[in-house]
Amino acid sequence: MQCSYPLARQLERSSALNNNLFQKAAIWLVIALVLFTVFKQFDKPRAQDSVTYSQFMDDAKNGKVSRVDVQGRNLVVSPKEGSKYTIISPGDIWMVGDLMKYGVQVTGKADDEPNVLVQALYYLGPTLLIIVFWFYMMRQMQGGGKGGAFSFGKSRARLIDENQNAVTFADVAGCDESKEEVVELVDFLKDPQKFQKLGGRIPRGVLLVGPPGTGKTLLARAIAGEAKVPFFSISGSDFVEMFVGVGAARVRDMFENAKKQAPCIVFIDEIDAVGRHRGAGMGGGNDEREQTLNQMLVEMDGFEANSGVIVIAATNRADVLDKALLRPGRFDRQVYVGLPDIRGREQILKVHMRKVPIGNDVDASIIARGTPGFSGADLANLVNEAALFAARRSKRVVDMQDFEDAKDKIYMGPERKSTVMREEERKATAYHESGHAVVAKLLPKADPVHKVTIMPRGWALGVTWQLPEHDKYSKYKDNMLEEIAILFGGRAAEEVFLNAMSTGASNDFERATKIARDMVTRFGMSDSLGAMVYVDTEQDGMFGKLSSKTVSEATQQKVDAEIRRIIDDQYALAKRLLEENRDKVEAMTNALMEWETIDAEQVNDIMAGRPPRPPRGAQGPNSGGNTPPGGSPVAPTNAPATARADETV
């Protein structure tokens, strides 16, 4: 029985392929037939204007013509010298007698009977070509889906039968609270009488809200898998097309199909593509989206009962959804699926490690502590990258070193070992990263330094990587001020030790300025401006979100002055710390020049005044380098908030 589904899918795929080939062959056959008919019609011999009838009769009289074939008014003349030509007879009744008198052989042929099919193709051929081309374009716009050009109103929802869906709650880890919120749906789908006897009504719609990659789709499939009911899956963008009314028709068709399979689950991924609040835009496309949303509102809670169909939707933009969509009776329950904590990350890692041969030295709890901020998708990618590292090294199992290398690659980008840079540029990068690391170690509330490297990775020439000791859910003023000082440690080290400035600190400045601005304008952390919000407000308008200024020019000048004060104070703090600890910066720079990468143990040795021990798997100074001047100073996009990624040029 396990082979029946793959075999059925293979037969279905083969049948679809054969149908597609047959349709293409039929189209090209029609085109070829029409073209052949047209060319044949135009291929008939035409009368030549170069020889007149009078000249032809003179040639016949002078014995220059041997034969004439008469076919209607067309005369095919065969001269004694030269090639045949055709002329049109003017209707001379004495012509045949004269030709025979001149000794010309005359033959007659009946006119060709007109072929009705050929004439029909000749006159209707262009119209047929236009119709065939129109059908072809309609199928192309529909992606070759079932039904062709007349399937616009058909739902694109994909039905996953209860016997095909093998996902259960055991496959979902790291979101125990979210699973508890939806377990009632499973009980209702298994035994609806239990709730109906007491007059209870199960939520008709559940909205899963959370960042990307946290397992919203997986949780919806697990609900259907646990309840053993059919599962319809569709994306919000599949409803709206270029033709008016298609979206509403697809919504109706989807719910009609779902009611036939009830009890069942309809899962709409990225519902914000069709469920955005109405009135925030203009134009035909916006009207079509609103019609689709209106139809969805009616289907979920209108005059007609929708018993047995539970709608589960997922989005990471719940703030843009229409209020009518979120009211009780439609999506009356919102379940937040957030980033997993350290325990959740450990559970997720163990789920994904089931499919990978793991070494005895691998500890999921240690990996979980070193991956704060990772989503479930990130952790799945981490396990996959570790397996790829092990495969490249021809290992039989995936060990802890493979996970460390995979984590470094995801956090900081892939190594660019082939990049070669001059010695002075490597040293400038080493001073820059040492400045970040030393300032981070000297500030009391900063996150511990996990690794420092001048090995080029991704867009960065060097990275100072900090990891928090535990998950953080809020920040305090002291933490944010220290974060700004750490960001300025790189530029301050360049000034103190090299008496120079590079473009490598540009990303540091962007992030430091943003933190300082948020402290003043959003979080009320300014003593002079007080606990007020000074950011521009946003409101819904005809063209979407519109922002308006809420502060005067004089107040804005005070805001800018306060941001400047915070920046200057933290830059001065970073510079003072480096000047007071020159020996530590020099020692760390020398260690980076020798090994290119040092970890937390070597950093602690240097800060304690001890010679740094050689790191495990130390790399020589010639194993890589930095990019030449002129490279982009932008940090890698996958660097976490606690990583310092800089490019020194």
Curated annotation (Swiss-Prot):
Q: What is its EC number?
A: 3.4.24.-
Q: Where is this region: Disordered?
A: 606-649
Purpose of the protein? Acts as a processive, ATP-dependent zinc metallopeptidase for both cytoplasmic and membrane proteins. Plays a role in the quality control of integral membrane proteins.
Swiss-Prot/TrEMBL keywords: ATP-binding, Cell inner membrane, Cell membrane, Hydrolase, Membrane, Metal-binding, Metalloprotease, Nucleotide-binding, Protease, Transmembrane, Transmembrane helix, Zinc
Q: Where in the cell is it found?
A: Cell inner membrane
List S-S links within the chain.
none
**UniProt entry tagged with the keyword Hydrolase:** yes
**Family per UniProt?**
In the central section; belongs to the AAA ATPase family.
Q: Report the protein name in the record.
A: ATP-dependent zinc metalloprotease FtsH
A single MF term (Gene Ontology): ATP hydrolysis activity
As cofactor, the record names: Zn(2+)
Q: Which residues form the active site?
A: E433
Which residues of the sequence carry a binding annotation for ATP? G210, P211, P212, G213, T214, G215, K216, T217
Supply the Pfam families for this chain.
AAA, AAA_lid_3, FtsH_ext, Peptidase_M41
Cytoplasmic compartment: which residues? 1-18, 137-649
Q: Which SUPFAM superfamilies match?
A: FtsH protease domain-like, P-loop containing nucleoside triphosphate hydrolases
Q: Name one GO cellular component term.
A: plasma membrane
Chain sites annotated for binding Zn(2+): H432, H436, D508
Which chain regions cross the lipid bilayer?
Answer: 19-39, 116-136
State the encoding gene: ftsH
UniProt topology in membrane: Multi-pass membrane protein
How many cofactors are bound and how? Answer: Binds 1 zinc ion per subunit.
Sequence ranges of Low complexity compositional bias: 616-626
Top-level taxon: Bacteria
- Keyword Protease (UniProt): yes
A biological process from GO: proteolysis
Q: How does it assemble?
A: Homohexamer.
